[in-house]
């Protein structure tokens, strides 16, 4: 659990990635039994699945399929936003720290750079769930 950002009990997390090692890395980082992880490989239906599964947060790989993580992030946020709520928070998994601008542009609530530690992922999740201002969490951040 990240200091300063207590995670709510029982968070349902939709993991959108089409590569097994990315899914495995997210699962390995999120070992807290308070997390319920739901894997989803089709980026085109991620927003509908997030709503159907009543997800609290969506974790999206930037390199997911042909659609890409930016488009998935926008799709989830657009499908879940209301006049008083900016939409379901998304944690974007980046390949390089220089891709932070992509996460900001897509409207991600938080992001981490692969490979990431369990602490970095928990911190990003906590920020997203608490709807904090976007802020990078990256192992190679300068």
Please describe what each predicted stretch is.
Residues 71, 92-110:
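Alpha4 helix (beta4-alpha4-beta5 surface) of REC/receiver domains from two-component response regulators
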Residues 10-21, 26-27, 39, 58:
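Conserved acidic segment of CheY-like receiver
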Residues 126-142:
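The C-terminal output helix
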Residues 116-125:
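C-terminal output helix
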């Amino acid at each position: 659990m990240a200091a300063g950002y207590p995670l709510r009990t029982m968070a349902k997390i939709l993991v959108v990635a089409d590569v097994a090692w990315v899914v495995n890395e997210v699962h390995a980082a999120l070992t807290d039994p308070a997390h319920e992880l739901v894997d989803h490989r089709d980026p085109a239906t991620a927003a509908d699945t997030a709503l159907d599964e009543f997800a609290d947060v969506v974790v999206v790989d930037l390199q997911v399929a042909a659609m890409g993580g930016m488009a998935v992030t926008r799709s989830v946020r657009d499908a879940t936003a209301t006049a008083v709520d900016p939409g379901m928070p998304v944690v974007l998994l980046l390949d390089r720290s220089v891709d932070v601008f992509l996460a900001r542009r897509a409207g991600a609530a938080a992001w981490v750079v692969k490979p990431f530690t369990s602490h970095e992922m928990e911190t990003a999740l906590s920020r997203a769930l608490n709807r904090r201002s976007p802020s990078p969490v990256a192992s190679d951040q300068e």
